[in-house]
Regions:
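C-terminal structural segments of small proteins and small subunits
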Residues: 53-83
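A short interface-forming secondary-structure element
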Residues: 33-46
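Conserved loop-to-beta-strand segment in the C-terminal subdomain of adenylate-forming
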Residues: 28-32
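N-terminal first-folded block
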Residues: 1-27
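Short, non-transmembrane amphipathic alpha-helical segments
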Residues: 7, 11, 47-61
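Solvent-exposed beta-strand sheet faces enriched in polar/charged residues
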Residues: 23, 33-35, 69-71
Length: 83
């Protein structure tokens, strides 16, 4: 069974992340917030595709569901300045 920490590690091994937080407690369903400079200039679909590419075959084999919020560093900064 996969842990949230393992999933974070898999993503950060293949994607530059300024911030990442993965939650999940059943080993197959996860929620993630991922902030990466690699998302700059990309649509949300392209950002998600980049995360899927970072996970490779794990998306088909180990992970049943991944709900994610992807943000550029600038968007993350704006979000945090509002709070």
């Amino acid at each position: 069974m996969l842990s949230a920490q393992q999933l974070e590690t898999y993503i950060t091994q293949n994607l530059v992340c300024d911030h990442i937080k993965v939650l999940g407690d059943d080993g197959t369903h996860f929620e993630a917030v991922i902030v990466s400079p690699e998302f700059v200039g990309k649509s949300m679909v392209q950002q998600h595709q980049r995360v899927y590419a970072a996970l490779g075959d794990r998306m088909r084999a180990e992970i049943h569901a991944l709900s994610m919020r992807t943000l550029t560093p600038e968007a993350w900064q704006k979000l945090n300045n509002k709070n």
